Amino acid sequence: MSRTIILIPVSTGVGLTSISLGLIHSLEQKGTKVAFMKPVSQPSTGEDKLDRTTSIIRTSTSLETAEPFMLSVAESLIGQNQSDVLLEKIVANHQQLTKNNDIVVVEGLIPTRKHGYANSINYEIAQALDAEIVLVAAPATETPTELKDRVEAAASLFGGKNNPNLLGVVVNKFNAPVDESGRTRPDLAEIFDSFQHNHISETEVNKLFAGSAIKLLACVPWNANLIATRAIDLVKHLGASIINEGEINRRIRGITFCARSLPNMVEHFRAGSLLVASADRPDVLVAAALAASNGIEIGGILLTGGYKIDAQINKLCRPTFEKAKLPIFRIEGNTWQTALSLQSFNLEVPVDDKERIENIKQYISQHFNADFINNLVADSSRLPRLSPPAFRFQLTELARAAKKRIVLPEGDEPRTIKAAVLCAERGIAECVLLADPASVQRVAEAQGVKLGKGITIINPADVRENYVDRLVELRKAKGMTETAAREQLEDTVVLGTMMLEANEVDGLVSGAVHTTANTIRPPMQIIKTAPGSSIVSSIFFMLLPDQVLVYGDCAVNPDPTAEQLAEIAIQSADSAKAFGIDPKVAMISYSTGTSGSGADVEKVKEATRIAKEKRPDLLIDGPLQYDAAVMEDVARSKAPNSPVAGKATVFVFPDLNTGNTTYKAVQRSADLVSIGPMLQGMRKPVNDLSRGALVDDIVYTIALTAIQATQ
């Protein structure tokens, strides 16, 4: 029996879309199958078009959603006194969602001046769907006590404490910036420095609702990073022409109007700042070029007045702007007109801003009461599935519990520093950055991040000598001398490996700059393979829309023998199990069963036999073609008696060419997130990054490494 939760906003401006996304993410992290519906579309423009939440969920997830009724259709039926007809149609849509989902999250209508009927319709929808009600509120000009009173007044419209289906309230956006009248600003003005902030502690809010009949289910503090828009969004809003595209998706975290003399403005030339200046201010352009050349990621430059950049200044600055990928755009209006236009910019998250959507999901989900979420999923009649959000959540939780220390040899690389900061903030691991502390601090400031607790910076020059004797001892048989050892320890990967060998750290992650060979070679020479392992292999975790699959080996072994392939299969199955995936191993080939022949097929057959013999406890079958392994209808015709075909979770490829090609084809064609490669078979955990790795990729690789260190 599925459950239905309806989120009902107490007023406008409560951040309803964000709360919907966060709640859904919290439920998915528990492995619950969730669906979403907005019974009546209510876009902020008032037009008849799809609402923002449904659009976001359809473009960023694979969740089942209902088609909402357009506002004009709903209003027409309400106006003709046919609310019952509208409700019947809503119930029909809802019933379709309950068939295959554990929980249906419903988003209610927002009460506005134009939609004064919203609360009565929300109540009728909640009744019709037998939905449990969660109110969503945000402080406006009230004190905490006044907010509580307003929530309780709103709750009374839905039966208050006498309604067992009224679960409680989510308080969002507390301590948001307000203008002089005390109003929360829903536009770009929120990121100007001129607005005041309330200073209410979360403890105050919790204490206040502790004495209320309405339970506090989540208390979400204001987070300015969640409204950091992209340069391209401002370009579209202003109708600006692009002079230098650069990283047009770069985040804008503040605005500086360059109307003063340069000495009075230069402190605002910082990461994420949008500099608004007349194009006839060459001093601003030159200063911005200098800042960019020093690694400061300015958010962008907006030139006003319609002037063209002076040719000599353009010639001087353009190479720096292009190298720094600094977005520069121009509009015809003057600075005053531009300021007015920026004030009208709506900061609702764009449907295509996947990074911001993901950040909102993660942030909001962290603030839900754990007991509330656990109680929602406790009655689920289906077996939990390991969805991608559930897998990522599990990685984070396991890494937190592990409390490991991970060394990052590329300690002053910008993405690595950002990842280390995130790991520290989330408690994923203590990161050790190997780099000159001054260099790390300089890069961190340029990136706009703060290095806090949970990060250790070690200057390689200060500690290299500590490992010379041990390296000579370990590699003496290979002719290692003190001079050669000192030279090798200049390589921070070698230095990090020696720290790992000495048990000073628990794992190593590298590869954002180094090649795979440079990352793996020192650990192979110094750490060596684990007992019982003859080779090192790798796997990728492929995060499909509704499940997580394991692909191996896609990164290390070019052409493994049958014995090695069997070992890769066993390693991959054990890794899958360690990370919560039930291993059903498919040995992939170009033929299924006995339908083909040749050396490659025979190798897979033999590898399957060896793996089954060594580990009879594992479900392993092969050779299987990829479609037979993954698709149930194909499996029924090609391998009807296979215990794995059609439901494989671990895919073992016969060689690196096949594995790497398949991994990249599936990842790119389906626009999937993958985590890895994760190395298997090492005595201590070492993991390689792609040189194109994103910050999140590095974070999850650090988490994987921390978890491996416990095994």
UniProtKB/Swiss-Prot annotation:
It comes from the Bacteria. Involved in acetate metabolism. It holds the Pfam family PTA_PTB. Pathway: Metabolic intermediate biosynthesis; acetyl-CoA biosynthesis; acetyl-CoA from acetate: step 2/2. One of its GO terms (molecular function) is phosphate acetyltransferase activity. Its EC number is 2.3.1.8. One of its GO terms (biological process) is acetyl-CoA biosynthetic process. This is Phosphate acetyltransferase. Signal peptide: none annotated. Residues 390-711 are annotated as: Phosphate acetyltransferase. It catalyses: acetyl-CoA + phosphate = acetyl phosphate + CoA. In the N-terminal section; belongs to the CobB/CobQ family. In the C-terminal section; belongs to the phosphate acetyltransferase and butyryltransferase family. One of its GO terms (cellular component) is cytoplasm. Disulfide bonds: none annotated. It is an enzyme of class 2 (transferase). It is found in: Cytoplasm. Homohexamer. The N-terminal region seems to be important for proper quaternary structure. The C-terminal region contains the substrate-binding site. PANTHER family: PHOSPHATE ACETYLTRANSFERASE. Keywords: Acyltransferase, Cytoplasm, Transferase.
